């Protein structure tokens, strides 16, 4: 995904007010820079798709069939949006809970989950049982999540506790995620690291002037960014 494409889709997201947080397209761009998608026409699960901007990219630019799945955005709302974008024949809107996804095992070439996985995937068995099982042998899971730069062990700064609220236990470090999603007989490779797109993705969110973005920016102005980061998780499933 080139810088020009990234800017093109960011312009779409600004115009239609579809951003719901840090720019998922910028995070996706970094994830894809570490791998090659390969052939056109892949079957992709966009898990926690929100308003479907990443689904739009895969449908229009990669010719993929995308199952855009979200718990908080209705399938009807997303379907109407996809019709407006002219991609309703390539994106299937699904309303579902990540704990009980209605898909067959070994079904997807690629699973993408950006800024959502930390809400439901922090138990050690979840990835192996609920996520990896859906991916075809040789396929990939691409995950980007907000996290912590260091582990505080119950002594989080007040600023962090105020921003995270009751969800503070969902924000983990790179090392904690390595313990949760480690290598297994079912994986060929697992890469977990801090992302470089942190500042840019957040700034795009602040630039929308959304009321929630303005609240987040106030926390950043107080120094929140010294504690949090974005973490990438790239897993390739074993061929057999």
Q: What spans do the regions from the language model cover?
A:
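Short, glycine-/aromatic-enriched active-site segment of Class I SAM-dependent methyltransferases
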Residues: 11, 146-167
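A short acidic, Gly/Pro-enriched loop at the edge of an enzyme's catalytic core
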Residues: 99-111
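Conserved alpha-helix/loop element of class I SAM-dependent methyltransferases that forms part
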Residues: 21-40
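Class I SAM-dependent methyltransferase Rossmann-like catalytic core
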Residues: 9-24
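A short SAM/SAH-binding and catalytic strip from SAM-dependent methyltransferases
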Residues: 110-123
């Amino acid at each position: 995904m080139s810088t020009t494409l990234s800017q093109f889709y960011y312009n779409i997201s600004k115009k239609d007010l579809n951003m719901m947080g840090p720019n998922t397209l910028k995070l996706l761009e970094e994830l894809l820079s570490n791998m090659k998608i390969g052939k056109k026409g892949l079957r992709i699960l966009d898990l926690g798709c929100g308003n479907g901007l990443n689904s739009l990219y895969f449908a229009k630019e990669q010719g993929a069939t995308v199952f855009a799945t979200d718990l908080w955005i209705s399938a009807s709302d997303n379907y109407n949006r996809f019709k407006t974008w002219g991609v309703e024949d390539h994106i299937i809107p699904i309303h579902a809970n990540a704990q009980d996804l209605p898909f067959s095992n070994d079904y997807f070439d690629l699973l993408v989950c950006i800024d959502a996985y930390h809400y439901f995937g922090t138990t050690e068995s979840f990835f192996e049982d609920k996520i990896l099982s859906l991916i075809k042998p040789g396929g990939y899971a691409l995950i980007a999540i907000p996290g912590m730069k260091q582990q505080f062990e119950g002594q989080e700064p007040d600023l962090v506790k105020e921003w995270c609220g009751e969800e503070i236990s969902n924000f983990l470090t790179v090392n904690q995620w390595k313990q949760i999603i480690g290598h297994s007989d079912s994986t060929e490779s697992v890469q977990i690291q801090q992302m470089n797109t942190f500042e840019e993705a957040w700034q795009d969110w602040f630039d929308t002037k959304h009321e929630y973005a303005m609240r987040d920016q106030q926390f950043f102005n107080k120094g929140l960014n010294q504690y949090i980061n974005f973490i990438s998780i790239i897993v390739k499933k074993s061929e057999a």
